[in-house]
Amino acid sequence: MNSNFNQHFERIKELRALLNKANYSYYVLDSPEIDDSVYDQLYRELIEIENIHPSLITDDSPSQRLGGVPSKGFKNVEHNIPLLSLDNAFNLNEVEAWYGRISKLISSENKNIKKVYDPELICELKIDGNAISLRYENGILTRATTRGDGKTGEDITTNIRTISTIPLRLLLENPPLWVEIRGEAFMPNNIFNKLNIERKNNDQPLFANPRNSCAGTLRQLDPKIVASRKLDFFAYSLYFPENWEPTDNNFKKPISQSESLEFLKNIGFKVNTTYETTKTLNEANKYYKYWEVKKDFLAYATDGIVVKIDKFEIQNLLGATNKAPRWAIAVKYPAEEKATKLRKIIFQVGRSGAVTPVAEFESIELAGTSVNRATLHNAKRLASLDLHYEDTIIVRKAGEIIPEVIRVIKEFRKVDAKLVQLPQNCPECNSKLILESNEAITKCINYRCAAKLKGLLRHWVSKGSMNIDGLGEKIINQLVNEGYVKSIADLYKLEIDSLLELERFGEKSANNLLIEINESKNKNWHKQLYGLGIPHIGEANAKSLSNNFNSIEELNAIAKESPEKISNIYGFGNEMKDAIVKWFDDSNNQTLIKELKAIGFSLKESLDSNYNSNQSNVFDGKSFVLTGTLDSLTRDEAKELIESAGGKVSSSISKKTDFLVSGEKAGSKLNKAQELGVKIINENELKLLL
């Protein structure tokens, strides 16, 4: 048996070495050494041996990349070396001013230099992702953290293990006791676009940009979701003990940023190879201008360049402020603007009846994507632009994300061009439009408007409300267009014959949808309330209302007789109160309430609720913050309990915080709560209060 174990022990070391080398060749060098089938065979053999001998599983094994069970949350950890941000320059003149300052500073700090010193520079692309710090101990990845505030970040080690371009073990013989690697995690553009297509097909909200998508992915509690999104990583700096010297003759200790990038590549990391060393600022300016034009052809997002002093000796001489190193500066690209021709204005009608003007124009390339439309938001914005049909307009992407029309080139306007004006009638149902008192929002007030109905139905079936997955936008459009559904209540009167007449419906899928629709009648009171689509009432506000009023009848009566009780709810105000009063004043909504109750909706707190009406308001007006790992509850479960009892959960501590619920390994929030005198309780005390 020992002989068998020893054989497996040696074989497992051999397999890991082969697989790690194959990963490095494939993901970092982009030069595969073995076929996929051979890799799969080696990987399966590794898994089989690890299943036989679980004690041989180590953190650096390729089998550990996909992670295990979902995490309950992320703990805060202090950076061993502060992860500073960079000072920004927004034009080349500011870069010249920075260069002049540091040249003089170097000369004044180093007495051996008799004149103003012009240091060698290195220019790198500024990747628009998320800064990550990696700590390796004896060559093995032990911790990965986000930037956070530069001093403290979140431990996301489990998620970082899923990124194939981050080695779990360094390709370095006799590594130092510790190494810290800094770099940028990012989502490649093609992965981002594919993910958004999937989300659109599933009726999920789209991600705004690759940077935000990457940040959200890294904070996923389930590492398998992180692995599925195929994040990437560029390493750009490293720190190691001063007295360490490599024993491998193939490596030499880097003494500059350019050498450190080569070193990083050799020990297993992917680095961005677009960097250049320059002897003059003029060459750095050329690098900036080149990539300002070429950036849209890259496979990842970049929002500028970073200019650094190349030699570590000079970097150490210059040092850093509390926020940023003096030896580097980020140079941002200006927001890209392009001229194009306005083709037409369409007017979209939302579920509240608000009419939004949208400009459609000749297609242009902005920030790497094709753009041919942009929202104009409301009547006031439309008027301020003074748009005429066939105008030449300037379009940019706000924050490199959302297209917006910023101005008109009036010199190119045709003499007989017609002014773009808001329609007098709804573009969907032809009803008379009204202009709200603030003179910004134009609305259709026809309750039976098909566009409003479609929007309301999409809201009703959304995850926060009834969560009817089978009812996507296309099916809703068909149901309304064919006249099968004229109100929310009609969804619950659908028959299988009607569904079978729609596209792509068979008997099984139609039956499944009808079952799903019928089961949604059992949703909680706050979800039913949210689904009604009362303006300004989001999910959190619907929960607050359901905690204060046990039924639609009670809320209806309060709206009519004592509306001030609504505005007195914690987090509410006159705007929400007025919206609720106005909603209940509408006879169409009163009819909807009757219809929903007639088909089986309770529109009230269920009898088996965890708390009765007296208990449910125990935290009314109280603000909570959660920190650390609780004994038996996840953070989401604790948040649900607090909110269901009328409380509000915030992410940050302030003087207005009433309670900090603290668990094991509490972070900096605990210290801040103590400083501010906030009451600190544990999970058991929270349950006692409930």
UniProtKB/Swiss-Prot annotation:
Organism source for this protein? Answer: Prochlorococcus marinus (strain NATL2A)
What InterPro entries does its record include? BRCT_dom (IPR001357), BRCT_dom_sf (IPR036420), DisA/LigA_HHH (IPR041663), DNA_ligase (IPR001679), DNA_ligase_CS (IPR033136), DNAligase_adenylation (IPR013839), DNAligase_N (IPR013840), Hlx-hairpin-Hlx_DNA-bd_motif (IPR003583)
> Which residues act catalytically here?
126 (n6-amp-lysine intermediate)
Matching NCBIfam families: dnlj (TIGR00575), PRK07956.1 (NF005932)
Keywords of this protein's UniProt record, alphabetized?
DNA damage, DNA repair, DNA replication, Ligase, Magnesium, Manganese, Metal-binding, NAD, Zinc
From the Swiss-Prot or TrEMBL record, what is one GO molecular function term? DNA ligase (NAD+) activity
Q: SMART domains from the xrefs?
A: BRCT (SM00292), HhH1 (SM00278), LIGANc (SM00532)
Instruction: Extract one GO cellular component term from the record.
Output: cytosol
Gene Ontology biological process terms in this record:
DNA repair; DNA replication
Q: Which residue numbers delimit the BRCT domain?
A: 614-690
- The UniProt annotation places NAD(+) binding at 36-40, 85-86, 124, 147, 184, 308, 332
Entry cofactors: Mg(2+); Mn(2+)
- Reaction catalysis annotation: NAD(+) + (deoxyribonucleotide)n-3'-hydroxyl + 5'-phospho-(deoxyribonucleotide)m = (deoxyribonucleotide)n+m + AMP + beta-nicotinamide D-nucleotide
Q: What is this protein called?
A: DNA ligase
Q: Which SUPFAM superfamilies match?
A: BRCT domain, DNA ligase/mRNA capping enzyme, catalytic domain, Nucleic acid-binding proteins, RuvA domain 2-like
Check the record and name the Pfam families matching this protein. BRCT, DNA_ligase_aden, DNA_ligase_OB, DNA_ligase_ZBD, HHH_2, HHH_5
Family the entry assigns:
Belongs to the NAD-dependent DNA ligase family. LigA subfamily.
Q: Report the superkingdom from the record.
A: Bacteria
Q: What does this protein do?
A: DNA ligase that catalyzes the formation of phosphodiester linkages between 5'-phosphoryl and 3'-hydroxyl groups in double-stranded DNA using NAD as a coenzyme and as the energy source for the reaction. It is essential for DNA replication and repair of damaged DNA.
* Disulfide bridge map: none
In this chain, Zn(2+) is annotated as bound at: 426, 429, 444, 449
| E.C. number(s) listed in UniProt | 6.5.1.2
